[in-house]
């Protein structure tokens, strides 16, 4: 019977690496510490009843390599042997996975823990700087990722080690500040009476914001797809869409600035995920950095902190692979999150 194990010993190769999001799951296999990961096609979570089926059909049936262990990054808190995902119907059951998929060792981490691991050593070719602040200090960092939800992860640098800090920062309160905000926010769809950052700063949140703007302006909303809203906004072909993406960038800047202060992220704030890349033209405009820096009495501090958009197509897998190769470089907690045969 597989048992929880708090060992910090390296996981045995070959290692299955998985980034399990609300909509898509991405997998690779790392055969040894020096090899490049073997990538597999993305898997839509809605296409499989369980994660075990997705791994079997999407990975194991397509390779002769049998992984001995797995590191999985999941969207949701990890509290026990059954790990439900926040934005999809899968439940990760490491004990069942070990018995059913022939593995010896499974480690489960938060998805933005994996994103945080990635930004420890992200090259310039895999990131785009937003704003004038520069520098690449060996100092704490933070990652925010608007996608199916809003993920937040910290990366603290201490004792010559990178320590990822998972959490549910996407669910902090987000409130109105400007006159326009006070017009719009009463029409934002709430969750149990509150507006969290994730109610606006994700795909469905973008639609939520667009619909609220339409209500305030007495316009009939014509779009229900986040991609339609962003494309019309960037083309300048729909006034409500343009304002939606502009305010999205502003609110993202506010939350990013808050997280920069929480983690004292002098090493930079990184925006990951597909939405950040798609709205890059909007993030390059002044609104994002102005909101990021508008943190009196600490405006001067925020002006020194660089902000980046992560452009690496598989950043979470890259971060997990870095940890799998050199676990001693990272302070990853395994307590309550690692199971061995």
UniProtKB/Swiss-Prot annotation:
Protein name as it appears in the record: Glucokinase
PANTHER family: GLUCOKINASE
Binding locations of ATP: 18-23
GO MF annotation terms: ATP binding; D-glucose binding; glucokinase activity
NCBIfam families the record matches: glk, PRK00292.1-4
Entry EC number(s): 2.7.1.2
Main location (coarse class): cytoplasm
GO biological process, one term: glycolytic process
Organism for this UniProt entry: Rhizobium leguminosarum bv. trifolii (strain WSM2304)
Catalytic activity: D-glucose + ATP = D-glucose 6-phosphate + ADP + H(+)
GO annotations of cellular component type: cytosol
Keyword line: ATP-binding, Cytoplasm, Glycolysis, Kinase, Nucleotide-binding, Transferase
Family: Belongs to the bacterial glucokinase family.
Top-level enzyme category: transferase
Transferase is among the record's keywords: yes
